[in-house]
Amino acid sequence: MDKKPTIAILKNEIDKLKSSFDTEKDEKDTKINHILSVVEGLSKSLSLYIEDNDKETTNEEVNIDEIDKNIVKNLEDKVNCLEQDVQYLKNELKKKDADWQQKLDLIVHQFTKQYDSLKSSLLISQKETSVFQSVQNNSNLPNNSNLPIETPILQIKFAALTEYAQKPKRGSEFSAGIDLRSAYEYLVPANGNKLIKTDWKIQYPDGYFGKICSRSGLSLNHNLEVGAGIVDADYREGVSVVLNNLSPRDFHVAPGDRIAQLVCTPYITPEIVFCKPSDIPDTVRGKNGFGSTGIN
């Protein structure tokens, strides 16, 4: 690859995205307008970065020869994915079939994930129109290049529904789960279960859901396991925990006791397609089900 990779190349690819939209858009179609706004924000950020780092260059090319070419290739691939998403979006909107709104939701979701990934890779500020902040003499960057550093921060929002909600917390800095606490006093009967309220309303980052898991200490020492542990991203009531007591003894839960852990987990929503059994190819395993692969 003789041609030096440049930020300008990426900007040109982003500009293609902008031109792929029809000039006239339905003002009520907020989702399409949102996609266009983030694309324009990305393009503007790239322009500002180019101007800030190479004001004397007339062709808007910024030499990033010091950057690993594999990194730039990865960025270009992501831009191409975005371009394909936009083209697919346009084609689907032209059809306006019965499922077009559902397809639009899926496309917007996938587009947003692709855009966030690209934005993170380009180290763009979380505000679409902000300017890159150059960082010099950083030993973590190749050849101390003036690449900006921006670490995207995911947030999970907790809103207390009552004064009895006990603050959740992580057990350690790198714990995957956030410990959930009981808001009230309960007695979980032997060989039975109880619905434990936390009195917290939760909002997850886009593309994530909450997975409620058992705590190892309760599982090992008291035979307490969590049941029905999926909290969907669009669920907006107070989060409760189904606590199953598999032991022959009742278990007392006091207000503030840690009864489960919440893991913020990414997910995808593939489109459901109905077909004939013959449309699904056979595999080596075939119909062999429970226990067919053995235990060793």
UniProtKB/Swiss-Prot annotation:
EC number of the protein: 3.6.1.23
Domain of life (superkingdom): Viruses
InterPro entries named among the record's database cross-references: dUTPase, dUTPase-like, dUTPase-like_sf, dUTPase_trimeric
Molecular function terms, GO-annotated: dUTP diphosphatase activity; magnesium ion binding
Reactions it catalyzes: dUTP + H2O = dUMP + diphosphate + H(+)
Keywords: Coiled coil, Hydrolase, Nucleotide metabolism
Gene3D superfamilies assigned: 2.70.40.10
Gene Ontology annotations of biological process type: dUMP biosynthetic process; dUTP catabolic process
Pathway in which the depicted protein is active: Pyrimidine metabolism; dUMP biosynthesis; dUMP from dCTP (dUTP route): step 2/2
Stretches assigned to coiled coil: 66-102
PANTHER family: DEOXYURIDINE 5'-TRIPHOSPHATE NUCLEOTIDOHYDROLASE
Protein's job: This enzyme is involved in nucleotide metabolism: it produces dUMP, the immediate precursor of thymidine nucleotides and it decreases the intracellular concentration of dUTP so that uracil cannot be incorporated into DNA.
Matches recorded under NCBIfam families: dut
Similarity comment: family membership: Belongs to the dUTPase family.
Protein's UniProt name: Probable deoxyuridine 5'-triphosphate nucleotidohydrolase
Organism expressing this protein natively: Invertebrate iridescent virus 6
Lineage of source species: Viruses, Varidnaviria, Bamfordvirae, Nucleocytoviricota, Megaviricetes
